[in-house]
């Protein structure tokens, strides 16, 4: 071997063993650097992990900070009573919903309608046909169909009615997102069911830090459950109540 070859081999060996000085000023070898951010220790952001898993096991709801969960319970004098309770927990990724249902009232296909008052405004207009006001978008899909519980994967529809009017007016021909595109998922039983709405798929719908939430469940397109609800009166024949206020946990 020539002297030049010996020298080249020695230099290659030295380079392979040479320590690398990272940005933090310490010393480390290449094998200790994070392959993603190139730092030691790793400075990659923590991967998001939802506190709620949509699997029909509701124990993770009990572990939530109760002050972060919005709850509505059926009024004793309500008109539509199939929905007994609804709990809503929202973070920056999901709107999670847990509902308890009177299963005796669910015997056929059961669509869920979820109404979002995106800015939680007190505007008395934009009322749905049951009298809840402030609605901006509708999420509509089934949770019980053809005799079995199914995963909730709704369509997303903008409200197109006149301001200050009580109308059931949605642009169903031009949904913001058609049903079956992964906007939400759900699991559970007829009597107890959880679902999660993926906020990034709301397609341009922006939520204020606190937004309004309403929900109905129907049988053959006739409502049997409504939350929030209230006592039926001559002025409030459907027993509607103001939307539940949900604050996003950031």
Please tell me what each predicted stretch does:
Residues 1-4:
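Bacterial N-terminal signal peptides that target proteins for export
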Residues 10-50:
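Bacterial Sec-dependent N-terminal signal peptides
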Residues 53-72, 107-190:
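Extracellular/luminal beta-rich ligand-recognition
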Residues 103-109, 202-207:
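A short beta-turn/strand-edge loop motif at beta-sheet boundaries
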Residues 46-57, 118-148, 188-190, 201-250:
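Acidic/polar low-complexity flexible segments
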Residues 90-96, 107:
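Extended extracellular/luminal ectodomain segments enriched in beta-structured repeat modules
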Residues 63-89:
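Short N-terminal edge-element motif at the start of the domain
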Residues 56, 94-102, 191-199:
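Short, well-ordered beta-strand segments enriched in hydrophobic/aromatic residues
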């Amino acid at each position: 071997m020539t002297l030049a070859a010996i020298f080249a081999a020695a230099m290659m060996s030295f380079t392979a063993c040479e320590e690398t000085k990272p940005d933090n000023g310490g010393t480390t070898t290449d094998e200790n650097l994070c392959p993603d951010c190139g730092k030691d220790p790793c400075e990659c952001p923590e991967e998001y992990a939802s506190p709620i898993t949509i699997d029909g096991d509701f124990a993770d709801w009990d572990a939530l900070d109760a002050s972060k969960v919005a709850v509505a319970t059926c009024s004793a004098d309500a008109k539509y009573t199939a929905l007994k309770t609804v709990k809503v927990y929202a973070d920056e990724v999901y709107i999670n919903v847990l509902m308890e249902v009177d299963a005796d009232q669910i015997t056929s296909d059961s669509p869920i309608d979820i109404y979002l008052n995106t800015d939680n405004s007190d505007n008395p207009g934009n009322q749905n046909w049951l009298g809840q006001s402030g609605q901006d978008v509708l999420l509509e899909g089934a949770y019980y169909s053809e005799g079995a519980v199914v995963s909730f994967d709704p369509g997303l529809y903008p409200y197109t009615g006149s301001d200050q009017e009580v109308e059931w007016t949605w642009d169903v021909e031009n949904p913001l997102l058609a049903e079956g595109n992964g906007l939400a998922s759900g699991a559970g039983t007829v009597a107890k069911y959880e679902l999660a709405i993926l906020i990034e798929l709301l397609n341009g719908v922006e939520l204020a830090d606190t937004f309004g939430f309403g929900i109905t469940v129907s049988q053959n397109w006739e409502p049997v459950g409504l939350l929030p609800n209230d006592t039926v009166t001559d002025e409030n024949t459907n027993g509607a109540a103001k939307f539940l206020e949900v604050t996003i946990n950031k």
